[in-house]
Swiss-Prot record:
Residues 557-577 are annotated as: Spir-box. This is Protein spire homolog 1. GO terms for cellular component: cell cortex; cleavage furrow; cytoplasmic vesicle membrane; cytoskeleton; cytosol; perinuclear region of cytoplasm. Residues 218-246 form a coiled coil. InterPro entries: KIND_dom, Spir-1_FYVE-rel_dom, Spire, Znf_FYVE_PHD, Znf_RING/FYVE/PHD. The lineage of its organism: Eukaryota, Metazoa, Chordata, Craniata, Vertebrata. Acts as an actin nucleation factor, remains associated with the slow-growing pointed end of the new filament. Involved in intracellular vesicle transport along actin fibers, providing a novel link between actin cytoskeleton dynamics and intracellular transport. Required for asymmetric spindle positioning and asymmetric cell division during meiosis. Required for normal formation of the cleavage furrow and for polar body extrusion during female germ cell meiosis. Residues 36-223 form the KIND domain.
Length: 761
């Protein structure tokens, strides 16, 4: 027996008489989630209730019966006898009600209040005696034992009558007077008055007993949740261990009854306090125990209110050293106690395993290992060019040497020889002289002359007009009379173009070679369009002539297409800020409802706008133009390299398309040859000013036609014209510096082939 009336002996751990296990108890006896039956509480704890809970259940049941007795007069069915703890329902708020069958037997007479009180007393006694064996009896406090005795013996007391012929003694009369008040129990109100007299302050009885029932409900719900978590944890542990069969119960394994016993002890210790020493006290304490708060709430309230006193833990009269130091100091002390590490200088690491070079490193290594070009001084170039003028032959010698069988193996002449304007000399016919002149011509073609630098303007136009312009020049000057070249059994003669860059003597780097076939003395076979296999080399060769335009430094900032586009967008934003004082125009331009160029055309649902791909502003159809601009990978090209090729060309009519194509091809070949042969003339550097420089079609095939506004188009054209004007100024200055070199040329430099000679070639 404990202070609170709870039994914690081993007998309390026995299962109920009906054999039901706590984990098998369901909520069948409850009407909802907000109430619990007393039988479930007893089964879950496997222990009886304490005396304070018995007082509370008795008081709350009598209150409910009193309310039902009042309603009996209004026609409500009277309550029946209480069969057991399963008929008592404890709600979440602390109120108690009794279970009544829905269909009572009409033939059974209704129970009287005395019978109901007697059944209530028996039910409370069973709850206090729950789990005990037959030969065991619980010792109760005198007031509670007297209350249960009165409730269970009301029927006997009422039927007893005093003997008329028997006179009691004085002592018996005094004892009867003392118990007169207690024995005078006739209904529910008398039981309630006895419960009120149990407390020191009867006015607090309703709240106190309701709090006791509420605490009983809360603790039971928490215990059930705790047991469910333990059960699920055990099941998960069995699944992890892979146990398929039901394991045998271990003697050391704690069951639900043990957990319930520990739970009750913890709750009692938290509510009553822990006593370190046994103190002789009275078994019955009339003072009420605090039930307004749960044990957890009481403990937290004490912590918040600091109703505690901490004592220093002393070891041999002093505080332990571990409590003096912080965790950081203890860790540092442990690290210092370890053996010291070797210094870095004394450590010897293993040699690092060589890693294979990455792809980027291999590419850089190949670039660095490329054979370096030998620099050629300008004096050597000038000396070799001036001394080689006597060995250059004329076009008449070319036709004369073409009849010799060894002609295909000889280089006749390039346009560079004609551009120099040297005196015509007859080339020897024999093989030795021909080989000597051949090697001399090869050496002359290695580097450009000053005359070539002077006439770079017209050469750029001739090299970038079309992809077959350079090949047309070479076919008009060089011919192969060997029939083997026509059949494809012998490689055709090859030569370097005019615009080839200077190369070292040991390197052979012809970027473009053309095979020349002769079918008739006065007829030249046209070139076939380049295939996909050699289009890359052809484009590179065509670009070499166009690259001469950028071989001189330009006295202005060289802007790329992407940079010019960014500059234009910044200028457009600045231009938009000028209209801030005009709110209507500013809002219309900012929202894209007004043309940004003319600022007169408004856009609506049926009138859509065009977006300029350069400045990203909406414009109308009249202010929108088409231009060919490079895509994102080619946006880093200089803006001056675009030229007129960015403008879409007008296609001729369908009827005149075939005739114009053939006539333009023949006239283009004629004009390109005339421009290449007129480099040495005084007016040759300005003769092609009307033909603007264009990029070849191979370069602009992947360019997309974009919609730009007229302002952006004018902006681009102004930048291109300014850059070309600065470039031409630089070339004119270079022409004046090198003009003295051409004055020493021989009289044969004024040679110009006639139109008849050009046609024959």
């Amino acid at each position: 027996m404990t202070d609170g009336g709870m039994l914690i002996s081993p007998s309390a751990l026995q299962d109920p008489g009906d054999g039901a296990r706590p984990e098998d108890i369901a909520m069948d006896c409850t009407d909802g989630e907000e109430e619990l039956c007393l039988e479930e509480i007893l089964t879950l704890y496997s222990q009886p209730i304490n005396e304070e809970q018995a007082w509370a259940v008795c008081y709350q049941c009598c209150r409910w019966l009193t309310q039902k007795h009042r309603r009996k007069e209004t026609g409500v069915s009277p309550p029946g006898r209480i069969a057991g703890p399963g008929d008592v329902r404890i709600r979440k708020d602390g109120n108690v009600k009794l279970y009544q069958p829905s269909n009572p037997d009409k033939h059974t007479p209704p129970s009287s209040s005395i019978e109901i009180i007697e059944s209530l007393g028996i039910m409370i006694y069973k709850a206090l005696d729950y789990g005990l064996k037959e030969h065991e009896e619980r010792e109760l406090s005198p007031p509670l034992e007297q209350l249960i005795d009165l409730m269970t013996n009301m029927a006997d007391t009422e039927t007893d009558c005093p003997d008329e012929g028997y006179e009691a003694t004085e002592e018996e009369d005094e004892g009867e007077e003392e118990n007169a008040e207690v024995s005078n129990v006739r209904g529910y109100r008398d039981i309630i008055s006895l419960c009120l007299s149990h407390l020191p302050s009867p006015s607090d009885a309703p709240n106190h007993y309701q709090a006791v029932c509420r605490a009983l409900y809360a603790e039971t719900k928490e215990l059930r949740t705790f047991l469910e978590k333990i059960k699920s944890a055990k099941e998960n542990l069995r699944k992890m261990e892979g146990e398929t069969e039901e394991p045998v119960r271990d003697l050391n394994e704690l069951q639900n009854a043990d957990w319930a016993r520990f739970w009750v002890q913890v709750m009692r210790d938290l509510r009553h306090g822990v006593k370190l020493k046994k103190v002789q006290e009275r078994q019955y304490n009339p003072l009420a125990i605090e039930y307004q708060l749960t044990p957890y709430e009481m403990l937290m309230d004490d912590i918040r209110s600091k109703r505690y006193k901490l004592r220093k833990v002393m070891v041999n009269g002093d505080i332990p050293p571990r409590l003096k130091k912080s965790a950081h100091e203890i860790i540092l002390e442990f690290i210092r106690s370890r053996p010291p590490l070797n210094p870095v200088s004394a450590r010897k690491l293993k040699p690092h395993a060589p890693q294979p070079p990455t792809l980027h490193e291999r590419i850089l290594e190949e670039i660095r290992s490329e054979r370096k070009l030998r620099p050629v001084s300008p004096d050597m170039i000038r000396r070799s060019r001036l001394g080689a003028g006597k060995s250059i032959s004329t076009p008449q010698d070319l036709f004369r040497s073409s009849d010799i069988p060894d002609g295909p193996r000889k280089l006749a002449i390039s346009t560079l020889s004609l551009a120099n304007g040297t005196s015509p000399a007859r080339s020897p016919v024999n093989g030795v002289a021909g080989g000597h002149s051949l090697s001399q011509r090869k050496r002359l073609l290695k580097a450009p002359t000053l005359a070539e630098l002077d006439s770079s303007d017209s050469e750029e136009e001739q090299s970038t007009r079309k992809s077959d312009s350079s090949s047309s020049i070479s076919t008009s000057l060089v011919e192969d009379t060997s029939p083997e070249s026509v059949m494809g059994k012998k490689p055709p003669p090859q030569f370097l173009p005019i615009s080839s860059t200077p190369q070292p003597d040991k390197r052979i780097a012809p970027q473009r070679r053309h095979s020349i076939e002769k079918e008739a003395p006065t007829n030249i076979r046209h070139f076939l369009p380049p295939s996909r296999q050699n289009s890359k080399s052809l484009a590179h060769a065509l670009g070499s002539g166009h690259a001469e335009e950028f071989c001189f430094p330009v006295e202005c900032l060289t802007l790329t297409v992407e940079e010019v586009m960014h500059i234009r967008q910044v200028l457009v934003k600045a231009e938009l800020e000028k209209f801030q004082q005009y709110k209507d125009i500013y809002n219309a331009l900012k929202k894209g409802k007004l043309c940004f160029s003319c600022r007169s055309k408004k856009f609506s649902l049926f009138t859509w706008s065009y977006t300029c791909q350069f400045c990203k502003r909406p414009v109308c159809s009249q202010c929108c133009k088409k231009m060919k601009l490079p895509s994102k990978p080619h946006a880093s090209l200089p803006i001056s390299s675009l030229g007129p090729s960015i403008l879409p060309k007008k296609e001729p009519g369908a009827s005149s398309a075939p005739t114009d194509k053939t006539s333009s091809t023949s006239s283009h070949k004629k004009n390109s040859l005339q421009r290449s042969l007129s480099r040495s003339s005084k007016h040759g550097d300005r003769s092609s000013s009307k033909d603007e420089l264009e990029l070849p079609e191979q370069f602009t095939e992947d360019w997309s036609t974009m919609e730009v506004c007229v302002d952006c188009k004018k902006f681009i054209n102004d930048i291109i014209s300014n850059s070309r004007r600065n470039l031409s100024t630089k070339r004119a200055r270079l022409h004046r510096r090198t003009h003295s070199v051409y004055s020493s040329s021989t009289s044969s430099s004024n040679y110009k082939p006639t139109e008849r000679t050009i046609k024959e070639v």
